[in-house]
């Protein structure tokens, strides 16, 4: 059914977002992904989404700035 497909896709997306945020935080803090993973697992879904939005927002802003300088 559509419900089970949607839940499955949503769970996979949440898992991928958690992995991405852990990777970014580990890089930022200079720690291993495993060390940061517990902190990420304790975060709410809203906090994780905010990390994803801010990360991609910064990238978009940097690209826009570069294109305006040229």
Swiss-Prot record:
Question: What broad class describes the main subcellular location of this protein?
Answer: secreted
Protein's cellular compartments: Secreted
What are the record's GO terms for cellular component?
A: extracellular region
Q: In which tissues is it expressed?
A: Expressed by the venom gland.
Q: Which GO terms describe its molecular function?
A: toxin activity
Keywords tagged on the record: Antibiotic, Antimicrobial, Secreted, Toxin
Q: Does the keyword Translocase apply?
A: no
For this entry, list what GO says about its biological process: defense response to bacterium
The function of this protein is: Insecticidal and antimicrobial peptide. Has insecticidal activity against larvae of flesh fly S.carnaria. Has antibacterial activity against Gram-positive bacterium B.subtilis B-501 (MIC=1.25 uM) and Gram-negative bacterium E.coli DH5alpha (MIC=2.5 uM).
| Domain writeup | Both the N-terminus (1-33) and the C-terminus (38-70) of the mature peptide form alpha-helices which probably disrupt target cell membranes. The linker region (34-37) probably derives from a processing quadruplet motif (PQM), found in propeptides of many zodatoxins, hinting at a fusion of two originally separate membrane-active peptides.
> Which family does the entry's similarity section mention?
Belongs to the cationic peptide 06 (cytoinsectotoxin) family.
Its name, as the record gives it, is: Cytoinsectotoxin-2c
Q: What is the lineage of its organism?
A: Eukaryota, Metazoa, Ecdysozoa, Arthropoda, Chelicerata
């Amino acid at each position: 059914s559509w419900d089970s497909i949607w839940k499955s896709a949503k769970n996979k997306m949440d898992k991928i977002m958690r992995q991405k945020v852990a990777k970014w935080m580990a890089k930022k803090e200079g720690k291993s992904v495993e060390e940061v993973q517990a902190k990420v697992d304790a975060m709410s879904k809203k906090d994780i989404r905010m990390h994803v939005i801010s990360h991609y927002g910064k990238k978009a802003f940097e690209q826009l700035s570069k294109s305006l300088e040229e």
